[in-house]
Amino acid sequence: MDNKKATLELGTKPVGKLLAQYALPAIIAMTAASLYNIIDRVFIGQVVGPMAISGLAITFPFMNLAAAFGAAVGVGASTTISVKLGQKDYESAENILGNTITLNLIVGLAFGGICLLFLDPILRFFGASDATLPYARDFMQVILAGNVFSHMYFGMNAVLRAASKPRMAMFATIFTIGMNILLDVVFILWWHWGIKGAAFATIISQVLALCWQMKLFTNKSELLHLKQGIYKLKSNLVRNIISIGISPFLMNACACVIVIFINNQLVRFGGDMAVGAYGIANSIAMIFVMFVIGLNQGMQPIAGYNYGAQQYDRMMRVVKLSIITAVCIMLTGWSLAMFAPYHCARMFTTDPELIKGSIKAIHIIMMMFPLIGSQMVITNFFQCIGKVKISIFLSLSRQLLFLLPLLAILPNFYGINGVWASMPTSDFIAVVVAVTIMLVFLRRFKKER
């Protein structure tokens, strides 16, 4: 299909079919991404041991922080490209592509280099003990050395979705997971590289996928393609990218702060095994969170295009449909957590103590899952239409304004259970706030129209 025709369909095709067309590939891609992280942890937990799982959990803040910088560029660029395509401003969209590549190179190299210089002190601050530090260090040395490739890979995937190529983005992710699993088998099972093997598998698979992505954008027949003159940073484009990307940046940066605090509270009230239990519970929860993130990625170009084209009824239909779908997804996750937590934990470890702690963590952490999907879609909606302040507030409220104080207070009264209970409590408050803000916004929006 002609690229311009595919883009125009964002404003004409039935919303349900359009959301399925864009969201399903993104959901598959994001679920695949979460699965290959889980597979890494399964290999590490079953082959290396429970302390390696705890060491890997210590590295979560690094992943959140890297994702924060990646989202600031990738999400900001993809949203801006979608709006420009809706406005038929193809030249600006192409320049954003080039600026995205330059920004990812700068951010990826700077982040990886700085973190490598201060790796051990940072890991100690993140909650690493003498037992878990060697595992966390071995993993992050490799991940940070290849960080620039990760930034480029995720950034280009975001641009592919914005450029009406959701299936290509899905293929890139599925290719990455397949290669990652294959390399896990070689590096961990056959060559016995341990936790470093998992890190090498991750980076190498992303490098190979990035090469394929870049090849796609060298095709001059594409609506967006690489050419001279688009890589030089332009202040107005960078401002647009960062102003929209600041919301997901803050959300991921806050997640980094929260995970650091969680890890330290877990070590204080439950020891290294509690950190491992959180790593397992978080892995299960992230499967369903990534489902909704994939749904949001599919919604983003549709909502962004129709907002830019002033087709507001279509924009709202896709938002409502996304909320209903997100609730159904998270309800499925809740059912799994309530009725099959043992089987979830057993995938990662055979250690009875770690399994017991993981079951409790899974039960409590995922308690409010049926509600939290709506909050995620609402936050993404405000980001899609450029309501940066509202999106930032909703991003901050769930993690920083609600969860952080609860983590500081509840464990002093309820010990390790207080750490677990802080998470669903903050989820519930965040949902109430997000729904209230959305209803107020819709009333005002209808009056202005």
Regions found by a protein language model. Give the residues of each.
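Short alpha-helical transmembrane segments in multi-pass integral membrane proteins
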Residues: M1-A23, I81-G146, W190-G245, A303-M368, ...
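Residue-level signal for short hydrophobic patches within transmembrane helices
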Residues: T12, G16-L35, I39, F62-F69, ...
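Residue-level signal for transmembrane alpha-helical positions in Major Facilitator Superfamily
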Residues: A20, Y36, D40, V73, ...
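Transmembrane helical elements of multi-pass membrane transporters/channels
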Residues: Q21-D40, V142, T176, S205-A209, ...
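Small-residue-rich hydrophobic transmembrane alpha-helices
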Residues: I53-G113, S150-A169, A277-P341, I372-S391
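Hydrophobic transmembrane alpha-helices of multi-pass small-molecule transporters
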Residues: L65-A68, N180-D184, L210-M214, M286-M290, ...
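Short runs within selected transmembrane alpha-helices of multi-pass transporters and secretion channels
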Residues: G74, V142-R161, A169-N180, A198-C211, ...
